[in-house]
A protein has these predicted regions:
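Cytosolic catalytic domains that perform sulfur/thiol-centered chemistry
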Residues: 1-88, 92-219
C-alpha cells in the first residue's frame, strides 16, 4: 500500500484538520431540496445573483418575503459563522445535485457530522473538500448539548488523527474508508486518483497484450 508521504498531492480541495464554531441542527431527513433548491423563491424575487452559500438552506433560512427566519439556527449568533455542522439522521438524502455539497462549502462548512448521509451527497462532499463524519446519534446529541451550553467554544475535527476534540469533552474517534480519507488529505480529484495508477495500468496492458494478443488484434 502506498504511504501518504510517497504520493504527490492533487489540485483538489484538501482537509487535514479544522477548528471552528459548531452548529447543532439535528433535524432528520434534511434533503438536497432543502440544502440547495433548484428554483428557490429568492430567484423568483429577482435575487439570482446570490452565491450558493447565501442560498444554502433557503427554504428554512428565509421567510416568504425574503427576510431571514430568526428561528433558524444559522441566522443566530454565533452560528452565523459556523464551519462545523452537527446534523440529523439521513442528512443530504434526495437528488444527486452536487450544489448541495458546494453550497455548504460556500457557506463556510468544512465538516458535517451526522448519524448517516445520503450516499451520493456523502461522496460529493469528498470531491469538494467537505469532511462528512458518521457518529452515533447519541454521541452527536451529547456534543450538541455541550455546544448549546457553550456555543462560542470551538470544536476541532482532525482527519490526520481521526478525532474530534472540544474542551470539556473526551476526544471522539471516527473511522473512514482509507481511499476517501487519503483523497481528502491529499486533495485528490477523481482524475488524480486514476492517474496515480497509470504506471500499474501500463504494466498490466503490456503483459496482457502478450497473454491475450487476440483481444488487441480485432481490426
Amino acid at each position: 500500500m502506498r504511504s501518504l508521504q510517497t504520493v504527490s498531492r492533487g489540485e483538489g480541495p484538501s482537509f487535514i484538520s479544522h477548528t471552528g464554531i459548531a452548529a447543532p441542527f439535528l433535524r432528520p431527513n434534511v434533503d438536497t431540496d432543502i440544502i440547495m433548491p433548484l428554483n428557490g423563491r429568492l430567484a423568483l424575487m429577482g435575487r439570482e445573483s446570490l452565491s450558493e452559500g447565501e442560498r444554502c438552506f433557503e427554504p428554512i433560512r428565509y421567510l416568504a418575503d425574503g427576510s431571514e427566519n430568526p428561528a433558524f439556527i444559522l441566522n443566530q449568533e454565533p452560528y452565523r459563522t459556523a464551519s462545523i455542522l452537527l446534523a440529523g439522521d439521513n442528512f443530504g438524502t434526495g437528488s444527486s445535485r452536487e450544489s448541495a455539497a458546494t453550497g455548504l462549502r460556500d457557506f463556510g462548512f468544512r465538516s458535517i457530522i451526522a448519524p448517516s448521509f445520503g450516499e451520493i451527497f456523502y461522496n460529493n462532499c469528498f470531491a469538494n473538500g467537505v469532511l462528512p463524519v458518521v457518529l452515533d446519534a447519541e454521541v452527536i446529541q451529547h456534543m450538541a448539548d455541550q455546544v448549546a451550553r457553550n456555543p462560542e467554544v470551538e470544536t476541532k475535527v482532525d482527519l490526520e488523527e481521526n478525532h474530534i476534540r472540544r474542551p470539556g469533552l473526551a476526544a471522539v474517534s471516527f473511522s473512514l474508508d482509507a481511499r476517501l480519507r487519503n483523497k481528502l488529505l491529499l486533495g485528490l480529484r477523481d482524475l488524480d486518483e486514476i492517474l496515480r495508477y497509470r504506471g500499474e495500468a501500463d504494466v498490466f496492458l503490456e503483459g496482457d497484450q502478450v497473454r491475450r494478443p487476440w483481444v488487441y488484434n480485432w481490426h
